[in-house]
């Protein structure tokens, strides 16, 4: 089994529970306030590690108490932290609203995540042997995302981009990506196509492949996901669960996918891992606290 390297954000998540989302200009009363570790990078690293992958993290935390707390979370999950720098200033913070239906809205203040440089990424990758997969997202600077994909590809790794949030990714960057994994909203921003229907999402996936990506996977929430390569396409059904909080579902999906691929499974089986992990993450509150274990995933897949 090769190493999964996650290049991405580490955040403190401040989660507010609401009865309903406020309208613009409206004040509503929250029910709960909780603090959790998060950030798409950390979430995906933990998701993969809990499913049995060997994981190394590359990123940055602040010089505040939150930075030390986040580093402790990384190491407590068995994730290598040699590539996580401590920089002056605050750590990244996410403000998350979750209503009673489990739907969420998220605002991210990058903090230390904005100080991850391409040189940091390249140097950290050069120190890691036997890299199977390099996974990154849109919560670190674009130049660092590009370094992760280009250097990862040069080292013979499979490169995976979760373009969340959707930035102005250059075509040259996408050509260095083996698998791109947006949700339907991010896919619409990346392609300019209407992805609100199944047909639209399929068209967006084909468009991303035409730009040079080997495989495009578009997640569609409760409607599952679709995928396309140059040779074929298909759908990824959901596993039946009762959702409580959808905050880390996409990150769990990514973690399930890379854990399966790093273990040597084919794409079709990796899709099942991804769907199961994503579904299980919706059954618990919070980001990192909701990420499933290997035994939980295997139980759901065998059900």
Short names for language-model regions:
Residues 60, 86, 96-133, 138:
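Conserved phosphate-binding/catalytic loop of the ribokinase/pfkB sugar-kinase fold
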Residues 1, 167-173, 198-303:
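Conserved phosphate-binding/catalytic region of the ribokinase-like
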Residues 73-88:
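A glycine-rich helix N-cap at a beta->alpha junction
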Residues 78, 114-119, 159-166, 237:
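Short gly/ser/thr-rich secondary-structure transition/capping motifs
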Residues 121, 131-203, 222-225:
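Conserved beta-alpha-beta core of the PfkB/ribokinase-like small-molecule kinase fold
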Residues 1-60, 65-76, 242-244:
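Glycine-rich phosphate/adenosyl-contacting loop at the front of the ribokinase-like
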């Amino acid at each position: 089994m090769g190493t999964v390297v996650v290049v991405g954000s580490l955040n403190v998540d401040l989660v507010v529970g609401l009865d309903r989302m406020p309208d613009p200009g409206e004040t509503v009363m929250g029910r709960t306030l909780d603090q959790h570790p998060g950030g798409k990078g950390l979430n995906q690293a933990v998701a993969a590690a809990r499913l049995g992958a060997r994981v190394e993290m590359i990123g940055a935390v602040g010089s505040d108490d939150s930075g030390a707390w986040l580093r402790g979370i990384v190491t407590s999950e068995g994730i290598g932290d040699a590539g996580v720098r401590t920089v002056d200033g605050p750590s990244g913070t996410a403000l998350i609203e979750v209503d009673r239906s489990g739907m969420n809205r998220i605002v991210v203040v990058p903090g230390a995540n904005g100080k991850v440089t391409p040189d940091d990424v390249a140097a950290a990758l050069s120190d890691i042997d036997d890299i199977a997969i390099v996974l990154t997202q849109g919560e670190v600077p674009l130049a660092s995302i590009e370094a992760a994909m280009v250097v990862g590809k040069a080292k013979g790794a499979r490169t995976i981009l979760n373009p969340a949030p959707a930035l102005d990714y250059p075509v040259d960057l996408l050509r260095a990506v083996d698998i791109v994994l947006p949700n339907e909203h991010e896919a619409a921003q990346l392609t300019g196509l209407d992805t609100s229907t199944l047909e639209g999402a399929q068209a967006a996936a084909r468009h991303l492949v035409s730009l040079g990506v080997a495989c495009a996977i578009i997640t569609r929430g409760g409607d599952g996901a679709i995928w396309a390569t140059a040779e074929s396409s298909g759908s990824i059904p959901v596993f039946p669960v009762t959702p409580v909080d959808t905050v880390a579902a996409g990150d769990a999906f990514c973690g399930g996918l890379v854990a399966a691929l790093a273990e040597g499974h084919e794409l079709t089986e990796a899709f099942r891992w991804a769907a199961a992990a994503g579904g299980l993450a919706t059954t618990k509150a919070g980001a990192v606290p909701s990420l499933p274990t290997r035994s939980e995933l295997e139980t759901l897949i065998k059900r």
